[in-house]
Amino acid sequence: MSGHSKWATTKHKKAVIDARRGKSFAKLIKNIEVAARTGGGDPTGNPTLYDAIQKAKKTSVPNDNIERARKRGAGEEAGGADWQTIMYEGYGPNGVAVLIECLTDNRNRAAGEVRTAMTRNGGNLADPGSVSYLFARKGVVTLEKNGQSEDDVLMAVLDAGAEEVTDLGETFEIVSEPQDLVAVRSALQEAGIDYDSAEADFRASVEVPLDVDGARKIFKLVDALEDSDDVQNVYTNIDLSDEVLAALED
């Protein structure tokens, strides 16, 4: 199993823990609100909204919160904020590339919090385009194994545009082009295969291998960035070997 795959597993476990703590609820709610505003409030005709709602349900966001967010975004209920998506780029310790995706109603606050988190943790912001070229936008679906083999999943999604299926230990990850994400998700549903999440993601084209000390520094930086309510996602181009991940888990 590659270092990248085990890192993806670590991220998946961390997301579950964060969700249980309630840390990610507000971010999931914002995704629903924005999806409803940009594509309409009917999930059956708005795949992005459908997937945002499904992810929120999978992470135990209360149905009442989900429905209120959908209504705010669709204009059926007052109180929706003017959310804006902003991407920041920078470098962390050891030259690791960092993409920071913000969803905010206050650009100045978001910029200040991102800058502070970066500078306090060995990072620095960079000019637009100086880091993003190292990443490609992809569609990513994750699902629990539930007794299915990699071949079972691959056969279900191959004709829908899936590029690869990766075994992450407890889960499978399916990667496609962003425009094929809905088709891949629909193919799983037609095959009766349940999935955890389906969303657009950034994947690095060039990765930086790190030792244990370097990995700890990057985790500290990512945690500091994710502590901001304005930060939705943080992407890096780190590559962690099995040995480094084992040492981090001890």
Curated annotation (Swiss-Prot):
<dbReference type="InterPro" id="IPR049083">
    <property type="entry name" value="TACO1_YebC_N"/>
</dbReference>
<dbReference type="Pfam" id="PF20772">
    <property type="entry name" value="TACO1_YebC_N"/>
</dbReference>
<dbReference type="InterPro" id="IPR048300">
    <property type="entry name" value="TACO1_YebC-like_2nd/3rd_dom"/>
</dbReference>
<protein>
    <recommendedName>
        <fullName>Probable transcriptional regulatory protein RER_29220</fullName>
    </recommendedName>
</protein>
<dbReference type="InterPro" id="IPR026564">
    <property type="entry name" value="Transcrip_reg_TACO1-like_dom3"/>
</dbReference>
<dbReference type="InterPro" id="IPR002876">
    <property type="entry name" value="Transcrip_reg_TACO1-like"/>
</dbReference>
<dbReference type="GO" id="GO:0006355">
    <property type="term" value="P:regulation of DNA-templated transcription"/>
</dbReference>
<keyword id="KW-0804">Transcription</keyword>
<dbReference type="InterPro" id="IPR029072">
    <property type="entry name" value="YebC-like"/>
</dbReference>
<keyword id="KW-0238">DNA-binding</keyword>
<keyword id="KW-0963">Cytoplasm</keyword>
<dbReference type="Pfam" id="PF01709">
    <property type="entry name" value="Transcrip_reg"/>
</dbReference>
<comment type="similarity">
    <text>Belongs to the TACO1 family.</text>
</comment>
<dbReference type="GO" id="GO:0003677">
    <property type="term" value="F:DNA binding"/>
</dbReference>
<dbReference type="InterPro" id="IPR017856">
    <property type="entry name" value="Integrase-like_N"/>
</dbReference>
<dbReference type="GO" id="GO:0005829">
    <property type="term" value="C:cytosol"/>
</dbReference>
<keyword id="KW-0805">Transcription regulation</keyword>
